[in-house]
A protein has these predicted regions:
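Short secondary-structure boundary segments
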Residues: 60, 111-139, 208-224, 230, ...
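Conserved phosphate/pyrophosphate-binding and hydrolysis machinery centered on Walker-type P-loop NTPases
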Residues: 66, 141, 215, 219, ...
Length: 503
């Protein structure tokens, strides 16, 4: 198959993916509108957004590109053959990060993205065996979860280890082109003249430093740039995990961990990427909480390290604290939106059914929480998988992004918080319903004391929708994930669309 035919096929697939994503968004908005229409007197009009860059850059609009696919593919194929191909300028916009600072988002035209992806796959196929086994980013044989699992297993072998944590300032934006190009002919990498030409075409938009974000070829370049650093760390006999520019290094030998500091500095100087001293933790002693004394000061010791969205202890893996805050915020909003807000705004439909064992709004709230935590599964399906009554489960939702979290106390605490949050909201809901004359005192659908409320929601005999009222459990889905990992392996049960960025 010639290049033009390949481009037509791949651009078509990319357009179909983006069009489906937009239609899914459209359907989600419509379903939300229908749900709100059932429970609210006043419903906001449906408002569908399109990305601004679809208008300012037609090459990013999948509907336009799909319609003109043959012309676009022919033009690009001809330009590559004649060596005058250059990607169009990307659309660049900013979104706020959690710390309030802006995060730059780069979106290349669809066809240029496809070119980048084709050459990235070709380069990776030929060269992935050259990359360190401790480099986990942007590869089809490794991923973020493998990194976390390997780190946890190795740290668990010792009651204490020295760890080095460093953060680079804008790794993708600062890396020197001179340093990068020197790597093309070093260290056994196979890069053809055509592939080098395509790389140069994408680098030409970046001046004399930086690699293009938002395009696949930069993923190969990021690993290529770090090859010598990886090699030096391996030669020193250090344990490490690198995901793009995020690197965690550990050892039981203090001298070796100090040597890693010099290696990081040397790489920073050679590649012209400054170290972010404010965000870099430097060298610390990682130890069990019960080990009170050490040769390090209290500031130089820690019981866990945060890496790629997880918090890793010597004997367990947890959610990071900021993730716990995010989880609670999301669930609290679902509860408030469904159970409290309509009553406070006097926007509650009187004929919404509230009878013994039935409260439509409560059912919707619990179903949405369940979908958030573990997708469209119900508790019985998960129990059947754990006990072996069913052989396969499609894991979705929050926990499928964090399959390695095994901090039982943290998960039990989340379960307790969820029950308490529901209980408080239901008590307030019953009070508001009584005050607004929707129901009479003592006639709410479920018991208002916590113990009986939980039993009633989780059993709810006689209600054909009883599965929809069952309270979801972080511990329950954790047990199912453990079974899945043992039975099928980590790569089979994790989300295929696990984010590659923003850890």
């Amino acid at each position: 198959m010639g290049l033009e035919s390949i481009l037509v096929d791949e651009i078509s697939k990319e357009c179909d993916k983006l069009i489906k994503r937009y239609h899914d968004y459209h359907n989600h908005i419509h379903l939300e509108y229908l749900r709100d229409s059932k429970r609210l007197n006043k419903v906001k009009d449906k408002y569908l957004k399109e990305p601004d860059y679809w208008t300012t850059n037609k090459g990013c609009n999948p509907f336009y590109v799909k319609k003109n696919i043959n012309v676009i593919a022919h033009s690009i194929s001809k330009k590559i053959t004649e060596k005058n191909y250059k990607p169009f300028s990307p659309s660049i916009f900013e979104i706020p990060k959690e710390n309030g600072l802006p995060r730059k988002i780069v979106v290349y035209p669809i066809a240029d993205n496809v070119v980048s992806k084709l050459f990235y796959k070709r380069l990776l196929k030929k060269n992935k065996h050259r990359f360190s086994s401790y480099a986990y980013a942007y590869r089809n044989d490794r991923n973020v979860h493998f990194a976390i699992e390997d780190i946890s297993i190795d740290l668990n072998r010792n009651s204490r280890s020295f760890v080095a944590e460093f953060d680079f300032s804008d790794f993708f934006g600062n890396i020197s082109h001179d340093y990068l190009r020197k790597q093309f002919d070093r260290n056994g990498f196979k890069i053809s003249d055509e592939e080098q030409y395509i790389i140069d075409a994408f680098l030409s938009n970046e001046g004399d430093k930086g690699i293009p974000q938002g395009t696949s070829i930069s993923l190969f370049l990021a690993n290529l740039a770090c090859w010598e650093l990886d090699h030096e760390l391996e030669k020193e006999g250090l344990n490490f995990a690198r995901y793009a520019d995020d690197t965690l290094i550990w050892s039981t030998n203090y001298q070796k961990i100090c040597n890693s500091f010099n290696m990081i500095n040397e790489f920073s100087r050679a590649a012209e990427i400054p170290i972010n001293t404010e965000k870099s933790e430097g060298i610390s002693l990682l130890k069990q909480p019960e080990y009170k004394k050490s040769e390090f000061s209290e500031k130089g010791t820690k019981t866990n390290v945060d890496f790629l969205g997880y918090s890793i202890f010597i004997d367990k893996i947890s959610f990071r604290e900021k993730m716990i805050t995010k989880i609670k915020k999301e669930i609290s909003y679902i509860i408030y939106k469904n159970l409290i807000q309509p009553l406070k705004n006097n926007n509650f439909k009187k004929y919404t059914e509230i009878t013994k064992g039935k409260d439509y709004n409560l059912m919707v709230a619990i179903m949405q929480i369940k979908r958030y935590i573990y997708g469209g599964l119900n508790n019985q399906q998960i129990v059947n998988y754990i006990t072996g009554r069913s052989n396969r489960l499609m894991f979705k939702g929050l926990m499928s992004f964090y399959p390695l979290v095994n901090d039982v106390n943290q998960l039990k605490s989340l379960d307790g918080w969820l029950v308490s949050s529901l209980h408080r909201a239901i008590k307030l809901r019953a009070k508001l319903l009584i005050n607004n004359n929707y129901i009479i005192s003592g006639k709410y659908a479920f018991p208002l004391d916590k113990a009986n409320l939980v039993i009633s929601l989780n059993t709810n005999k006689g209600n054909k929708y009883r599965r929809n009222y069952e309270i979801p459990s972080f511990m329950l889905i954790h047990k199912a994930l453990e079974v899945g990992i043992k039975k099928e392996g980590l790569s089979k049960i994790m989300r295929l669309d696990t984010p590659e960025y923003d850890y």
